[in-house]
Amino acid sequence: MRTKAGIATAAALSVIAIGALAPAGDAASGVCGSDSGSGGTGATGSGSSCDSGKYVNPFKHQSWYAGRIDMGVDYMPNHRYPVRAIGKAKILGSDSHSGWPGGHFLWYKLLRGDHKGDIIYVAETLKKLVPAGTKVAPGETIAKALPSGTGIEMGWANKRGETRAASCYSEGMKTHSGREMARFLNELGADVVSKAKSAPDYPTGPRC
C-alpha cells in the first residue's frame, strides 16, 4: 500500500462507528479479508491469508472519536475496547510507567506484508498491555483502551520505542509522521479528521 496522493481537510472531531466504515477498509489493498460478522477483526488464525501478511482495521466494529493528528493520530473510545494489532507482529516494548499521559506505552514491529519491519506505537489511557517479546496475529488484542483521560494515540516509532517525530515535535504540531499514520489507518477503514492524501502511508521522509 505504499502510495502517495493530495491533502484534503475535514471538519473537526467527529464521532465514528467503525463498523459502518468496514467496507472501505476491506476494499483497501493489503487489508485482512473475510469478516465473521460477529465483531471480529477478520483474522482467521494461523496459516490464514491474514497471518501471511495482510492488515486489519484496528477499530472495526467499535465506536471511537477521531481526534487530532500530531506525532501520531489521537482516538477516544466510547467504551472499553480491545486495542488490536494491525498485522502479524512482535511486541518490542510494553511500559505502564512511561511519561505519556495515562502512563502507558506499547510498540510493536510488523512481521509480514508490505509494511514488514515498520514499528507502530500505541500510547496513553490503556491497561492490560501485552508484554514485550509476545508475537501476535492480525487483530489480536494487545491492550485495553479506556473511555477516559486522553484516549489513545497511535503512530510510527523506532525500535527503541521513540516516536518518529519526537526529535522535532512541539505541542500541537501536525507532523508529517502523523499524517503518514493517518493515511495508513484511513486506508484500513478507520476514520481520521484530516485525510492526508499527499502523504505516504508508511514512515519515510521528514519526521515533522
Question: How would you label these PLM feature ranges?
Answer:
Residues 141, 148, 158-160:
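Internal hydrophobic scaffold segments of catalytic domains
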Residues 27-106, 137-138, 178-208:
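Surface-exposed, glycine-biased beta-strand/turn segments
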Residues 76-79, 84-85, 110-141, 145, ...:
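Short histidine-centered loop motifs in beta-beta connectors
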Residues 86-129, 149-156:
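Zn2+-dependent peptidoglycan hydrolase active-site motif and core
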Residues 152-170:
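Short, compositionally biased
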Residues 1-27:
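Secretory targeting and sorting signals
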